[in-house]
Design a protein with these regions (language model features):
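Short helix/loop capping segments that flank catalytic or ligand/cofactor-binding pockets
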Residues: 115-116, 158-160, 215-217, 251-254
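Short, structured patches in soluble enzyme cores that scaffold and shape functional sites
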Residues: 110, 151-153, 209, 218, ...
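A short, charged helix-loop
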Residues: 171-189
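Active-site beta-strand/loop microenvironment that shapes enzyme catalytic pockets
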Residues: 184-229, 235-237
């Protein structure tokens, strides 16, 4: 079974979403990120590639750079550029490219599912890249970027997504690369509970993109569990940020939402 949970997302207000949105951290280098964020203090690159706030050539793996990430993450929240929802939700993220729109459910995926092999991998990972993202997760106490999972098509989940996306989206914009980004908040408690039940009937999830981010999030969550003498299993660190797409809708790309992982009790 696939264990998921809703969560209180940390996300930009509508007025700021286009300025905050960025490409994934690993599809561009530091100088490219610096150029894309030029003149935009709200760009998420200041958190996911914080070396852009230092002189060119700064080692992106230095302690000062990781520290800058959390300083910027905190500052974004203090200034209201990222705001945490006041209740737990699932969300729907959709992307339009080349005339095709694909829809994914944004969920908290279970660390234990990854450790047990219920979340399936198809790539080997490098320890140095895992450790880089682990440091980023540790210092921010959050998953700043999601991973992408695929799940076997499910007609009831399809129906829920269709119903929820029949209303105007919370976010709806076209990025400079021409991709459309659309986002809905699932607010109905019965719908949220039913989504959880339906995923519990799915034997496995499959990593579509983000093997290193998945490994890092799961390893840090497992680490926090070992360090917590009062660990129960329902703390936020037991889950990490994932967008789950029906297998028939892949391939995918994404925008940003944050799942906090600092809860201990």
């Amino acid at each position: 079974m696939a264990k998921i949970k809703p969560f209180k997302g940390i996300r930009p207000p509508k007025d700021f979403v286009e300025q905050v949105a960025s490409r994934p951290y690993d599809v561009l280098n530091s100088e490219e990120a610096r150029q894309e964020a030029d003149g935009n203090e709200k760009s998420l690159y200041h958190i996911i590639k914080p070396e852009i706030d230092f002189v060119s050539g700064t080692d992106e793996h230095s302690p000062e750079v990781y520290q800058k990430a959390v300083e910027n993450f905190n500052m974004f929240q203090e200034k209201g550029w990222l705001v945490q929802d006041n209740k737990e939700h699932y969300y729907i993220y959709a992307q339009t490219m080349n005339g095709h729109t694909q829809y994914g459910l944004v969920v908290g995926a279970c660390v234990e599912d990854y450790m047990s092999g219920a979340i399936k991998k198809h790539e080997l990972t490098r320890r140095d890249k895992e450790e880089d993202r682990m440091k980023h997760v540790r210092i921010n106490n959050a998953n700043i970027e999601p991973v992408f999972f695929a799940y076997p098509d499910n007609t009831e989940l399809d129906a829920i997504i269709k119903q929820e996306t029949s209303v105007s989206p919370e976010y709806d914009f076209v990025a400079p690369d021409g991709f459309g980004h659309h986002f809905w908040v699932i607010d109905n408690d019965k719908t949220i509970a039913r989504i959880t039940e339906l995923f519990a009937q799915i034997p496995s999830l499959y990593i579509a993109d983000g093997h290193h981010r998945t490994a890092a999030a799961a390893l840090v969550g497992n680490e926090k569990a070992r360090q917590n003498p009062n660990h129960r299993g329902d703390e936020e660190y037991n889950y990490f940020l994932a967008v789950c797409f029906p297998a028939s809708q892949l391939p995918v790309s994404y925008t940003h939402l944050t799942l906090p992982t600092n809860s201990r009790v």
